[in-house]
């Protein structure tokens, strides 16, 4: 509630300027095991403040309902779209200018970059707000710091790889410290290659 009240003036301003907002949550429903924001609860909170202007989509919604909500967002009937990461790819709404990501420390670096890419497709400067709870892990703090420092997808992918590790290339492990005996698959960083091309 406190975070919502702090963001409220921005929401009102964006809506008054006929711009739209994505609000991303990591969970569909409230969980007793995970202390993360749910899309359903956030929808209820935001809808109380902006009645009949808020939509909700997530992976558990029927496709027809989801398509109807997205169509209402496209024609600007809905001003704020509360969603899980189902909007991560394949969504293009140039009028959506702001994205708010709840529990941003829960997401990976590349995923945050993908989500952030849902806005900034129009002619106005976009806004990305990363919300998180206190006591961030060192790794989570580093991810958010990187995201704040660059919009370059190649640099973000490289940093993400460095943070998560390569995992097991021939196995099932998708992250972890690399264990190469003869060669490092990333001996030259993308940044160095770009600098070499420029020179």
Explain the meaning of each model-derived region.
Residues 1:
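Conserved AAA+ ATPase "SRH/arginine-finger" region at the nucleotide-binding site
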Residues 22-26:
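Conserved RecA-like ASCE P-loop NTPase motor core of nucleic-acid helicases/translocases
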């Amino acid at each position: 509630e406190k975070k919502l009240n702090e963001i409220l003036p921005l929401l009102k301003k964006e809506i008054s300027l006929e711009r739209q907002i994505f609000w991303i949550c990591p969970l569909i429903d409230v969980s007793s095991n995970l202390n993360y924001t749910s899309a359903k609860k956030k929808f209820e909170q935001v809808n109380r403040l902006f009645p009949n202007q808020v939509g909700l989509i997530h992976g558990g919604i029927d496709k027809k309902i989801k398509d109807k909500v997205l169509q209402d967002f496209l024609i600007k009937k809905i001003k704020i779209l509360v969603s899980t990461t189902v909007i991560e790819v394949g969504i293009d709404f140039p009028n959506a200018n702001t994205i708010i990501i709840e529990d941003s420390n829960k997401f990976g670096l590349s995923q945050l970059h993908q989500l952030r890419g849902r806005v900034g497709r129009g002619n106005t400067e976009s806004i990305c707000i990363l919300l998180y709870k206190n006591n961030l892990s060192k790794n989570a703090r580093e991810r958010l710091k990187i995201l704040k420092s660059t919009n370059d997808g190649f640099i973000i992918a490289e940093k993400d790889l460095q943070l998560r590790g390569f995992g097991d290339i021939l196995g099932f492990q998708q992250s972890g410290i690399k264990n190469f005996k003869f060669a490092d698959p990333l001996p030259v960083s993308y940044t160095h290659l770009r600098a070499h091309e420029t020179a």
